[in-house]
From Swiss-Prot:
This is Sodium-coupled neutral amino acid transporter 3. L-glutamine efflux and L-glutamine uptake are regulated by CO2/HCO3(-) through SLC4A4 leading to modulation of cytosolic pH and Na(+)concentration. Phosphorylation at Ser-52 induces internalization and sequestration into an intracellular reservoir. During dephosphorylation by protein phosphatases, can recycle back to the plasma membrane and regain activity. Prolonged phosphorylation results in its degradation. Belongs to the amino acid/polyamine transporter 2 family. Highly expressed in liver. Expressed in skeletal muscle. Expressed in kidney, heart and brain. Not detected in gut, lung or spleen. Expressed ubiquitously in hepatocytes in liver whereas in kidney expression is restricted to the medulla. Within brain, expressed in glial cells. In the cerebellum, expressed on Bergmann glial fibers in the molecular layer and astrocytes in the granule layer. Expressed in brain kidney and liver (at protein level). In the adult kidney, highly expressed in the outer strip of the outer medulla and medullary rays penetrating into the kidney cortex (at protein level). GO terms for biological process: amino acid transmembrane transport; asparagine transport; cellular response to potassium ion starvation; female pregnancy; glutamine secretion; glutamine transport; histidine transport; intracellular amino acid homeostasis. The keyword Transmembrane helix applies. It comes from Rattus norvegicus. Changing N76Q: Abolishes glutamine transport activity. Increases the alkali-induced substrate-independent conductance. Does not affect cell membrane localization.
Length: 504
């Protein structure tokens, strides 16, 4: 028996990285919508207040977003904190293998968007979770919502980890301290809690976060600024640095530095070998490469809302927007990884920006980049938290009236859990690895393929047709990558051989 189509309203809200959690609100009739508005006056309205009393339906919504702005919005959705870990990924794969893997993930991401657009065109649904509902009923919707929620939690965790990692260095620079001191305002754990309570939580408790949508452009600008700084610093930082020759755990004692300076003077061949790039590398940390790349390319839940906002929409036009956005991010990712790697080689840490503190803690350019990135991620966290809270409302409290107590408790509980994760996580690599190995393969590979297989009518494409066979193979690749990545990461943890950069 065919599941009846649902009429959906989708709200497009550009923000720093993630629109993933935008959850559609069912709108079967105008009367029921007015009743729901009375009940859910807080969460139900979304980020931006509507100027019109009539909410848009996907069937009658007239998009007004141009081609260029849609490319900007989708590029903004792709871009995120994942760019900070790509140089570390290149250090553990080599330039050639990294380029191959980055190209493969980009092409596969484009193909999965193609599957999503074809599926949405068949059933007239432009919301990721509702495609899951159309394909597998409530379990499909819940699975998609869970994956999107995990992805958003991973994004918030990575943002808070950047605050934990970078804010002490900014304070150290402003106080003109050569070395960090054991005081509370230099402790990243205290600082991330302080920022969460004083700045993030009050913003997350607001009913409307529309004005924070402007952080969208600011966040993307910060990452472009970061890329320019990385390229510039490649030609300013000499190689070799004594700091670079220690292991990536960040243990830079004075004695080690002196010994290594002596070693460099007596053994120039060692220095030359260190400053020679690797083109193909396999080690225990290579297992993190694909998850980091997958984390960096997740934008699929945003594709359909952006499609809804597009002026004169068509699948072909939206596919061109997706291809162009992925291509732009592909170039930015490769340049950031390449120049970051060629600056520090094997000394690069899992959070690239933190590595520059080993060169010159008082560098003005890097300080400006740090401050800009800190402001961007701090403003982005409450925006990313909003759809996660809404997902919880939709799944657990769908038919209940808005409650301030529940509103506050959900936000506080989420921030508490994420803070605990950030405090006890040894480095950002673990966050990139786990989220990139679980929710990212589901959103990029598995769900688009199986949704397409289920939704596409057999009259148009039989079960054994080439497109459906390719879709199943695509899903199988996703399962394989997820299983392999998780296996390698867990093995790395259990064996205790992990030497992640960026411990603080």
């Amino acid at each position: 028996m065919e599941i009846p189509r649902q009429t959906e309203m989708v709200e497009l809200v550009p923000n720093g990285k993630h629109l993933e959690g935008l959850l559609p609100v069912g709108m079967p009739t105008a009367d029921t919508q007015r009743a729901e508005d009375a009940q859910h006056c807080g969460e139900g309205k979304g980020f931006l207040q509507q100027s019109s009393s009539k909410e848009p339906h996907f069937t009658d919504f007239e998009g007004k977003t141009s081609f260029g702005m849609s490319v900007f919005n989708l590029s903004n959705a792709i871009m995120g904190s994942g760019i900070l870990g790509l140089a570390y990924a290149m250090a553990n794969t080599g330039i050639i293998l990294f380029l191959f893997l980055l190209t493969a993930v980009a092409l596969l991401s484009s193909y999965s968007i193609h599957l999503l657009l074809k599926s949405s065109g068949i059933v007239g649904i432009r919301a990721y979770e509702q495609l899951g509902y159309r394909a597998f009923g409530t379990p499909g919707k819940l699975a998609a919502a869970l994956a999107i929620t995990l992805q958003n939690i991973g994004a918030m965790s990575s943002y808070l980890y950047i605050i934990k990692s970078e804010l002490p260095l900014v304070i150290q620079t402003f106080l003109n301290l050569e070395k960090p001191t054991p005081v509370w305002y230099m402790d990243g754990n205290y600082l991330v809690i302080l920022v969460s309570v004083i700045i993030i939580l009050p913003l997350a408790l607001m009913r409307q976060l529309g004005y924070l949508g402007y952080s969208s452009g600011f966040s993307l600008s910060c990452m472009v600024f970061f890329l320019i700084a990385v390229i510039y610093k490649k030609f300013q930082v000499p190689c070799p640095l004594a700091h670079n020759l220690v292991n990536a755990t960040g243990n830079f004692s004075h004695m080690v530095v002196v010994e290594e300076k002596s070693q460099l003077q007596s053994e120039p061949d060692t220095a030359e070998a260190f400053c020679t790039p690797s083109y193909f590398t396999l080690n225990s940390q290579t297992a993190y490469t694909i998850p980091i790349m997958a984390f960096a390319f997740v934008c699929h839940p945003e594709v359909l809302p952006i499609y809804t906002e597009l002026k004169d929409p068509s699948k072909r036009k939206m596919q061109h927007i997706s291809n162009l956005s992925i291509a732009v991010m592909y170039v930015m990712y490769f340049l950031a990884a390449l120049f970051g790697y060629l600056t520090f080689y094997d000394g690069v840490e899992s959070e690239l920006l933190h590595t520059y503190s080993k060169v010159d803690p008082f560098d003005v350019l890097i300080l400006c980049v740090r401050v800009a990135v800190l402001i961007a991620v701090t403003l982005t966290v409450p925006i990313v938290l909003f759809p996660v809270r809404r997902a919880i409302q939709q799944m657990l409290f769908q038919n209940q009236e808005f409650s301030w107590l529940r509103h506050v408790l959900i936000a506080t509980g989420l921030l508490t859990c994420i803070n605990l994760l950030v405090i006890f996580a040894p480095n950002i690599l673990g966050i990139f690895g786990i989220i990139g190995a679980t929710s990212a393969p589901c959103l990029i590979f598995i769900f688009p393929a199986i949704f397409y297989f289920r939704i596409m009518p057999t009259e148009k494409e039989p079960v054994r047709s080439t497109p459906k066979i390719l879709a199943l193979c695509f899903a199988a690749v996703g399962f394989l990558l997820m299983t392999m990545s998780l296996s390698f990461i867990i093995t790395d943890w259990v064996s205790g051989t992990s030497q992640h950069g960026g411990n603080h």
